[in-house]
């Protein structure tokens, strides 16, 4: 594989995707506030842990109504306008935190900001779907995923350096970077919302999974059983992956003691380095494989990546496991987006993005709590064999879904 072939699919992407790539980097670099919410509430606002936990949960949960609102509006009005309006409102409510005197108001301003932040997500996903086709979506989604991770690799580091002495700059920086990303979209990306004539033509003429549909989100979603089952199975993936954020640091603190947080930070650095430097290579190597088979492969990498932690007592093994599950993360994130969009009607892209994001996100929401119950009863080490089995099961179920979907399409083709 030569260098030219690595970037072949990316070079062919439309200009608008590269604009979104740079906008994604800028937006992610400036995500200073929400990753530090727990520290901000406890150290700066002096809330106790219970009160801080409530407000963190509130800000997280606030994205759900935002997703539903943004998904609905993105399918009715121009996607670009919806993204610009909600992103701007999200930024302004973060900036408003600098203007209030009473600290009790700040968590509510951040919660409102989270609602609008959630609302811009379906519009962004719908725009990417509109601007791409099944042939170039693998490259497009992997590029945007790379942009997000480049930003997140830089942003928290800057925030950590500025937090103690220049906290106000974090609120200003978060606001400014969001507005810059909005300006990039406003000036350089054309509206992508499907016109009425193309929707009518799609209803009559198209036969694929992206065919325009009439009816409620629930009827249309349930009429795509393969996408429904994909979403349910992929929820297991999110439960497996959340162990990297919850159980892994607990395990490392137990093994390495006071050095645990430092080593966990190194693990997160390895994760970021692998994503930044290997995403293009991995996607180029797997681009000819069907998206759903790639997602099945990702679960196997999860299985061995997290499973090896059961035997890990040295940092080297933790580093090796991180490389494995990060490769799974790259493949799962990119190709799940591709599969979902390829099975989403053009009339429901915003709403599908919202509802599927919420369903899959339940693994991240309930995963830490269920893992905590397991750890309390059986110990932290015992969870890794369970995670290994769950990942293998997820891979098998995903492959079964591919088998039945492929057989169904073959039957329809020759009937």
Predicted regions and their residues:
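Juxtamembrane intracellular "pre-TM" segments in multi-pass secondary transporters
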Residues: 1-14, 192-230
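Residue-level signature of mid-helix packing/kink "hotspots" within the transmembrane helices
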Residues: 32, 60-68, 152-153, 272-280, ...
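Cytoplasmic helix-loop-helix junction between adjacent transmembrane helices
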Residues: 111-148
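A membrane-interface helix-boundary motif in multi-pass transporters
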Residues: 164-176, 373-391
């Amino acid at each position: 594989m030569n260098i030219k072939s690595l970037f072949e699919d990316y070079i062919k992407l439309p200009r608008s995707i590269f604009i979104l790539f740079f906008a994604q980097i800028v937006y992610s670099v400036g995500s200073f506030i929400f990753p530090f919410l727990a520290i901000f509430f406890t150290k700066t606002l002096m809330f106790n842990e219970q009160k801080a936990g409530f407000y963190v949960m509130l800000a997280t949960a606030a994205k759900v109504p935002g997703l539903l609102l943004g998904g609905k509006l993105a399918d009715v009005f121009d996607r670009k306008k919806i993204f610009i309006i909600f992103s701007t409102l999200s930024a302004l409510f973060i900036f408003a935190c600098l203007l209030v005197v009473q600290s009790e108001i700040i968590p509510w301003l951040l919660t409102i900001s989270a609602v609008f932040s959630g609302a811009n997500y379906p519009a962004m996903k719908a725009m990417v779907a509109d601007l791409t086709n099944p042939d170039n979506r693998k490259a497009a989604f992997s590029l945007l995923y790379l942009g997000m991770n480049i930003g997140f690799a830089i942003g928290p580091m800057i925030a950590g350096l500025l937090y103690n002495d220049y906290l106000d700059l974090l609120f200003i920086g978060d606001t400014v970077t969001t507005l810059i990303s909005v300006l990039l979209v406003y000036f350089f990306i054309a509206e992508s919302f499907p016109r009425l004539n193309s929707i009518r033509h799609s209803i009559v003429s198209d036969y694929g999974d992206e065919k325009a549909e009439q009816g409620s989100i629930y009827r249309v979603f349930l009429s795509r059983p393969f996408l429904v089952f994909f979403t349910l199975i992929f929820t297991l993936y999110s439960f497996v992956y959340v162990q990297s954020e919850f159980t892994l640091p607990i395990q490392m603190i137990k093994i390495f003691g006071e050095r645990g947080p430092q080593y966990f930070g190194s693990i997160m650095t390895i994760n970021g380095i692998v994503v930044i430097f290997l995403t293009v290579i991995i996607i180029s190597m797997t681009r000819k494989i069907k998206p759903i088979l790639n997602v099945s492969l990702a679960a196997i990498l999860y299985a061995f990546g997290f499973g090896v932690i059961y035997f890990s007592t040295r940092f080297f093994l933790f580093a090796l496991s991180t490389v494995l599950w990060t490769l799974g993360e790259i493949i799962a994130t990119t190709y799940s987006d591709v599969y979902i969009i390829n099975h989403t009607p053009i009339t429901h892209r915003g709403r599908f993005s919202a509802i599927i994001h919420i369903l899959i996100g339940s693994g991240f929401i309930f995963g830490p709590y269920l893992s905590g119950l397991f750890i309390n009863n059986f110990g932290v080490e015992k969870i890794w064999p369970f995670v290994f089995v769950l990942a293998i099961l997820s891979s098998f179920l995903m492959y079964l879904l591919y088998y039945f979907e492929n057989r169904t399409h073959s039957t329809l083709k020759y009937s």
